[in-house]
């Protein structure tokens, strides 16, 4: 029953009890042995079965358009963190569809955690190519624009002392393209990323 319910959303085989392990990991937040030990005398696994069904039902209601990228997402963790919130599913679907079509998003599976958390790390935004970095470095003549603006003594850096940065951030519509690439010294790139 669990396999039929969740086969599109969870990796694993029911024969090797991987679905059970996934459900236990979700409900126990990874502390399976402690969860099992505390419930070893329970007459049944209704708590676990109810939780598992609730997670899958929440996924289906929150993201009604199924895509193969949904399989294997850590839905249990997302359910525990965001399952109590009400979402505009049409707006979520519009966002998911746009991100699925975005070539800069290399982790399509990460779209689902991203639309709930807002954390870009899940998307694995495409990095600038070596050629794009070199072109930006040459165009800037190795000068970090932030160092120059601050009037620092050292404004020119070797290419291996610099990192590529989106001039217009990806979240504001900036593309991972040569035109949107600038080279910053490591210090300024890290400072800019922390904002």
Predicted regions span which residues?
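General structural signal for secondary-structure boundaries
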Residues: 1, 43, 129-130, 195
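Solvent-exposed functional surfaces
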Residues: 1-119
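A near-ubiquitous, low-amplitude feature marking generic local secondary-structure context
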Residues: 42, 119, 127, 164-168
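Short, charged surface segments at domain edges that flank catalytic/cofactor-binding sites
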Residues: 105-152
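Long, His/Glu/Asp-enriched segments that create or flank divalent metal/ion-associated functional microenvironments
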Residues: 122-125, 183-187
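Histidine-centered nuclease catalytic patch
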Residues: 130, 136, 148-184, 195
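A generic secondary-structure signal for well-formed alpha-helical elements
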Residues: 188-192
């Amino acid at each position: 029953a669990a396999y039929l319910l969740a086969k599109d959303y969870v990796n694993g085989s029911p024969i090797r009890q991987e679905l059970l392990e996934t459900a236990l990991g979700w409900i126990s937040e990874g502390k399976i042995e402690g969860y099992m030990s505390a419930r070893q005398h329970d007459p049944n696994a209704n708590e676990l079965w109810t939780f598992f069904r609730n997670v899958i039902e929440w996924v289906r209601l929150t993201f009604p358009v199924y895509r193969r990228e949904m399989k294997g997402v850590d839905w249990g963790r997302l359910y525990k963190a965001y399952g109590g919130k009400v979402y505009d599913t049409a707006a979520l679907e519009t966002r998911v569809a746009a991100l699925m079509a975005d070539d800069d998003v290399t982790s399509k599976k990460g779209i689902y955690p991203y639309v709930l958390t807002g954390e870009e790390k899940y998307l694995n935004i495409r990095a600038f190519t070596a050629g794009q970095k070199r072109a930006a470095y040459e165009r800037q003549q190795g000068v970090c624009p932030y160092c120059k603006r601050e009037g620092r003594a050292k404004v020119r850096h070797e290419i291996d002392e610099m990192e590529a940065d989106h001039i217009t951030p990806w979240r504001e519509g900036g593309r991972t393209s040569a035109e949107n690439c600038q080279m910053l010294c490591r210090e300024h790139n890290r400072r800019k990323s922390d904002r």
